[in-house]
Every structure is written in C-alpha cells, then in structure tokens.
C-alpha cells in the first residue's frame, strides 16, 4: 500500500530535525523550533494479545424475577453405608417353636425320699365349746401335719389329698368338711343324718382336695344339729393322707 503524502512530509521533517539536532550537539544548540501543526489521528492499531484473567467481581444484586422451578435432576450414585443406629424397641413375641426332642430317661426315684403326710385321730376328751370338731387323740401323724389341739390338718406338701370321717351320734347331726386358703374358706361339703329313734348311727363323709402349702382342713358341725356321742362304746375318727404331690 502507498503511504499518504502527509505522512511522508512528517517523516522527512522529523528526520531533518534529528540531523540538525545531532549537528548542533557537536557545535552549539540552536533555539527550538515551533511545534508543528496538529494532524488527524492515525488509524487504530491491531488488537493486542489477550490479557490475564482479572479478580472476581462483587456479587450482583438479584434484580430479575425468579424463574420457575426446573425439572428434577437425575438420581445421584448411592452413598456410603452409614453407621449402625441404636437398637430399636423389642418386637412382639414370636410364634411358639416346635416341640423339642424327647429327653433321656432319668434315674429311677427313691420312694423313701418322697414325703407322704398322713394322719388319723379319734375323739377321747375333746373340748365341748366351739363348732370345730376336735379329734384330740392321735393314732398316726406322719410328718406332723395334723394339729390335734386345733383339730386341723395344715398342708406342707402341695398335692391331692383324701380326707374322710366317721362320727357316732344318737341325734340329728350335720357335719362339714371345711378347707381354707390364707384364712379364706375355699370348700364346705356338708353331710347330715336325721335320727328320730335315738339309736347309735354313724355319719360319714369323704372328699379329695387339691391343697397348696399353708391350706387348712378340718371338720365343723352345725350349731343346731351338732351333738356327737362321747363314750367308750364307739369312737369317732378323722383321717387324711396325700394321694400324690402336685408337679
């Protein structure tokens, strides 16, 4: 491209001034000339290289309207297993299990080691007051469960017992086999005999009772029909024994 004439004139002027200045330095400095006339700006130069990245700017204030919620993104990859939590509350009981196998047969028991309470007592010189029939003369009292002063059997071995009585009378007579637990009456079995001729008759009765430790058993008479014969001609007896213990 051919350079404009204006540029050539300027370049020749600058070159002449430089040569004159150089010649003056060898001899003596002359007075500076006047500034040249101002010219029009030249054309823009070519773009320079890309500059370095600047510092981040301050956060801008949100001025626009908030847009709509976007679509749900894809699920991320599973995270690592967490720590074991605290034990939870106990669940409900499970169903009963299947019956176990039959155990090995045990050694035979020793009948001598088994307790076998039993008693039998008759009336000889009992007290006349009260409604409890006292059988004061003991015939047998295995393990001492019968208390002759009270007329009561007090259970010490839980199980099933058989009790029986035979009482002689010449009058109308009603008797009861009584049992109590913690001083509360549990059973009351009545047996009556009506005697209009005044002859010797025997009133008898018996029963099987399941007893726990501390239960009491005795014979009790009706206050209005409770006269018992007392003499050497006939005896009245009260007996009882353990049939088998409770398991």
UniProtKB/Swiss-Prot annotation:
Region (Disordered): 26-116
Protein name: Complement C1q subcomponent subunit A
Keywords in alphabetical order: Calcium, Collagen, Complement pathway, Disulfide bond, Glycoprotein, Hydroxylation, Immunity, Innate immunity, Metal-binding, Repeat, Secreted, Signal
Primary role: Core component of the complement C1 complex, a multiprotein complex that initiates the classical pathway of the complement system, a cascade of proteins that leads to phagocytosis and breakdown of pathogens and signaling that strengthens the adaptive immune system.
Subcellular localization(s) per the UniProt record: Secreted; Cell surface
Positions carrying 5-hydroxylysine: 50, 69, 102
GO CC term (a single one): collagen trimer
UniProt-listed PANTHER family: COMPLEMENT C1Q SUBCOMPONENT SUBUNIT A, EMILIN ELASTIN MICROFIBRIL INTERFACE-LOCATED PROTEIN ELASTIN MICROFIBRIL INTERFACER
Residues that, per the record, bind Ca(2+): 201
Positions bearing 4-hydroxyproline: 41, 47, 56, 59, 81, 87
Species of the source: Sus scrofa (Pig)
C1q domain residues: 112-247
Activity regulation behaviour: The C1Q subcomplex is inhibited by sulfated molecules, such as triterpenoid sulfates, heparan sulfate, or chondroitin sulfates.
GO annotation, biological process: complement activation, classical pathway; innate immune response
Domain of life: Eukaryota
Gene3D superfamilies from the UniProt entry: 2.60.120.40
UniProt biased composition (Low complexity): 98-109
Post-translational modification: O-linked glycans are assumed to be the Glc-Gal disaccharides typically found as secondary modifications of hydroxylated lysines in collagen-like domains.
Domain Collagen-like: 33-111
Species lineage: Eukaryota, Metazoa, Chordata, Craniata, Vertebrata
Pfam families the record matches: C1q, Collagen
Residues bearing carbohydrate: 50, 69, 102
Stretch forming the signal peptide: 1-24
Subunit structure: Core component of the complement C1 complex, a calcium-dependent complex composed of 1 molecule of the C1Q subcomplex, 2 molecules of C1R and 2 molecules of C1S. The C1Q subcomplex is composed 18 subunits: 3 chains of C1QA, C1QB, and C1QC trimerize to form 6 collagen-like triple helices connected to six globular ligand-recognition modules (C1q domain). Interacts with CR1 (via Sushi 24 and Sushi 25 domains). Interacts (via C-terminus) with CD33; this interaction activates CD33 inhibitory motifs.
Disulfide cross-links: 174-192
Comment on protein domains: The C1q domain is the ligand-recognition domain, which specifically recognizes and binds the Fc regions of IgG or IgM immunoglobulins. The collagen-like domain interacts with C1R and C1S proenzymes.
Biased composition (Basic and acidic residues): 27-38
């Amino acid at each position: 491209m051919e350079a404009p004439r204006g540029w050539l004139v300027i370049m020749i002027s600058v070159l002449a001034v430089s040569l004159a200045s150089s010649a003056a330095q060898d001899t003596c400095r002359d007075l500076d000339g006047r500034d040249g006339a101002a010219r029009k700006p030249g054309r823009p130069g070519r773009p320079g290289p890309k500059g370095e990245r600047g510092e981040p700017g301050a956060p801008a204030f949100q001025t626009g309207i908030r847009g709509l919620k976007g679509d749900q993104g894809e699920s991320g990859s599973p995270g690592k297993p967490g720590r074991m939590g605290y034990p939870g509350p106990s669940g409900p009981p499970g169903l009963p299990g299947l019956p176990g196998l039959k155990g090995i047969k045990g050694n035979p028991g020793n009948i001598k080691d088994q307790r076998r309470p039993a008693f039998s007592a008759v009336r000889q010189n009992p007290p006349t007051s009260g409604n409890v029939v006292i059988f004061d003369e003991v015939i047998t009292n295995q393990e001492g469960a019968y208390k002759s002063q009270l007329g009561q059997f007090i259970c010490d071995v839980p199980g099933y017992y058989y009790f029986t009585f035979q009482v002689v009378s010449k009058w109308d007579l009603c008797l009861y086999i009584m049992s109590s637990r913690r001083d509360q009456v549990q059973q009351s079995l009545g047996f009556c005999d009506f005697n209009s001729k005044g002859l010797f008759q025997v009133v008898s009765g018996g029963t099987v009772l399941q007893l726990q430790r501390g239960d009491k058993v005795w014979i009790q008479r009706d206050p209005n029909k409770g006269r018992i014969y007392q003499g050497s001609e006939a005896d009245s007896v009260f007996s009882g024994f353990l049939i088998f213990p409770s398991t």
